[in-house]
Amino acid sequence: MEGDSYHNATTVNGTPVYHQPLERHRLWEVISIAAVTAVVSLITIVGNVLVMISFKVNSQLKTVNNYYLLSLACADLIIGIFSMNLYTTYILMGRWALGSLACDLWLALDYVASNASVMNLLVISFDRYFSITRPLTYRAKRTPKRAGVMIGLAWLISFILWAPAILCWQYLVGKRTVPLDECQIQFLSEPTITFGTAIAAFYIPVSVMTILYCRIYRETEKRTKDLADLQGSDSVTEAEKRKPAHRALFRSCLRCPRPTLAQRERNQTSWSSSRRSASTSGKPSQATDPSTNQAKAEQLTTCSSYPSSEDEDKPATDPVLQVVYKSRGKESPGEEFSSEDAEETFVKAQTEKHDSDTPNYFLSPAAAHRPKSQKCVAYKFRLVVKADGTQENNNGCHKVKIMPCSFPVAKEPSTKGLNPNPSHQMTKRKRMVLVKERKAAQTLSAILLAFIITWTPYNIMVLVSTFCDKCVPVTLWHLGYWLCYVNSTVNPICYALCNRTFRKTFKMLLLCRWKKKKVEEKLYWQGNSKLP
């Protein structure tokens, strides 16, 4: 071989014999391999870019668990852009034509990204395990900052393990033993070293992750059984028999979905708010100029809570609002409410008649701009509409009362007194937490299964080649190695299949609907109607 790696030729009796590119494959083979690998690479890139964009644009996805998935997507994106395409070129040409430096850089990037994927899966497995088995102690420490530290350590360990050895081994031993037309890790030329790295990089992590997942599954099933027993005992209480509406109220307090655009357009209102102390002094609140309201009263942003599908056959309950106070940050979500926390609000209802007799009120801020120094503190409130004696000001605004969900509604002729059973509330809360844990465990199981299926063939061939060097055909080596890359293609599909939020966000991004959705929501929540 010539010393200059950029001259693609060998010499026979001093005469250069140039290699013909793609000489080892027929034309149809080249076209087929190139087309298939190009499609897989494109799907990998698009899928993992969608994961990153989804994490950026959808705040619902910014959870601690999804930080680990974001890190995994970064590793998969590197593999989709660089590893897949360079390895395909290497296969089609039958030789490495980019030189030793490019070879070492590619191998370092490839092995660091692949090992980072394994490390991220380990971190996700331990995170799920501790979240299930130590919910009180571990979850208090489970913060985005801590997740960032763990992700950084996963990448740092992967870099330290592979990059220095791949790039510097030839200098440590004093020479490069890898032929110029080949690209492989020099220190893995010994079968025993290859065997050891396969054990450390694949078999041990897979064994640990499998054990952790089995324990996660067993603990989740145990908690599901305990919760079912608790729900069974709770459902036979007399309070539940007499007041079936309790379940609907508690569910409404926990869920506050945003209305659809059509509902928003039908139910836009303008409003102003004042403290209850103003009305108790005998002076009814009046709708005033928005600037005056902003100076004298805390502004509210609300969304109406509609009953879920499982509540449709139950008696209608009072609407529940999620209220965001624009305040100086003195309040906190954990504060206890008293009767003084009730709000009396003038709303100008522009609702249409629906099947239910209870009107739906959508309240918008009086002004689009708020002082930057103010903070948002979220509370959940119940909207109580008085049927008799409802006051109306000269602008046609009706007075309604907003009560905290935790504050019982006074028994008035026009309202239903709802006082949820505390034990039932606890059961509901436990069920919601358990549902989230089960979804996270399902995502982990899908990712882990995909990892085992795609990585096992290659690592089995590594073990076989240790004892029988010529037993594995070159074609199988290529397929096994490429199958490891396919894991990066499958991971985003697993996220979409197991996580509804990912799936919906992917769909909106692919259909270019996300920007339109954001604009509509911004217009709605800022309020597109002004006070008269």
Swiss-Prot record:
GO CC entries: dendrite; plasma membrane; postsynaptic membrane; synapse
Residue numbers of Phosphothreonine PTMs: 501, 505
Compositional bias segments (type: Polar residues): 282-308
Membrane-crossing segments per the record: 30-53, 67-87, 105-126, 147-169, 192-214, 444-464, 479-498
Name the record gives this protein: Muscarinic acetylcholine receptor M5
Intervals, Cytoplasmic compartment: 54-66, 127-146, 215-443, 499-532
UniProt source species: Macaca mulatta
GO biological process assignments: adenylate cyclase-inhibiting G protein-coupled acetylcholine receptor signaling pathway; chemical synaptic transmission; dopamine transport; G protein-coupled receptor signaling pathway, coupled to cyclic nucleotide second messenger; gastric acid secretion; transmission of nerve impulse
InterPro entries assigned: GPCR_Rhodpsn, GPCR_Rhodpsn_7TM, Musac_Ach_M5_rcpt, Musac_Ach_rcpt
Keywords for this protein: Cell membrane, Disulfide bond, G-protein coupled receptor, Glycoprotein, Membrane, Phosphoprotein, Postsynaptic cell membrane, Receptor, Synapse, Transducer, Transmembrane, Transmembrane helix
Topological domains, Extracellular: 1-29, 88-104, 170-191, 465-478
Function, in words: The muscarinic acetylcholine receptor mediates various cellular responses, including inhibition of adenylate cyclase, breakdown of phosphoinositides and modulation of potassium channels through the action of G proteins. Primary transducing effect is Pi turnover.
Molecular-function GO term, any one: G protein-coupled acetylcholine receptor activity
Glycosylation site list: 8
Topology with respect to the bilayer: Multi-pass membrane protein
Annotated S-S bridges: 103-183
Similarity comment: family membership: Belongs to the G-protein coupled receptor 1 family. Muscarinic acetylcholine receptor subfamily. CHRM5 sub-subfamily.
Lineage per the UniProt record: Eukaryota, Metazoa, Chordata, Craniata, Vertebrata
Compartments in which it is found: Cell membrane; Postsynaptic cell membrane
Start and end residues of each stretch annotated as Disordered: 262-365
Gene3D superfamilies, alphabetized: Rhodopsin 7-helix transmembrane proteins
Bias type Low complexity, positions: 269-281
